[in-house]
Amino acid sequence: MLIQEHQPASACHIGHYQRGQIEIDGHIYRQAVLLDGSGSVQTVNLASAAELQAADLARAAASQPEVILIGTGERQQFLHPRIAAAASGIGVECMPTAAAVRTYLLLQSEGRRVWAWLWP
């Protein structure tokens, strides 16, 4: 039986993550990035997930992903409940970036719509 991995056309390929950097589509990023499900990678000028605003999550929710992942770096941090509430019923999951990368890749391989903010 021939088995082939299905990679959605809009998918970003995360090659690896290590403290301080993330490799996405062959490029090394040393600052936070946003993967919005369109296949593009946007750098984010925020020092930590704590700087995310309700408007950021509302913008993500407007595109109706199934889940929003927040990779908070080496240690898990949580968003203020008021910020997370702006996602309008869409699941917001905060976790260390290594776990967020694994979760993103798994959900992406299933063809699920997912947004991710990742801090290296």
What are these regions, as identified by a protein language model?
Residues 51-52, 74-75, 98:
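Short beta->alpha connector loops
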Residues 53-58, 102:
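A generic local structural motif
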Residues 1-55, 63, 109-120:
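Non-catalytic interface/targeting segments
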Residues 89-109:
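C-terminal structural segments of small proteins and small subunits
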Residues 60-95:
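Mid-chain, well-packed structural core segment of small domains
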Residues 43-44, 76-80, 103:
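Short active-site-adjacent helix-start/loop capping segments
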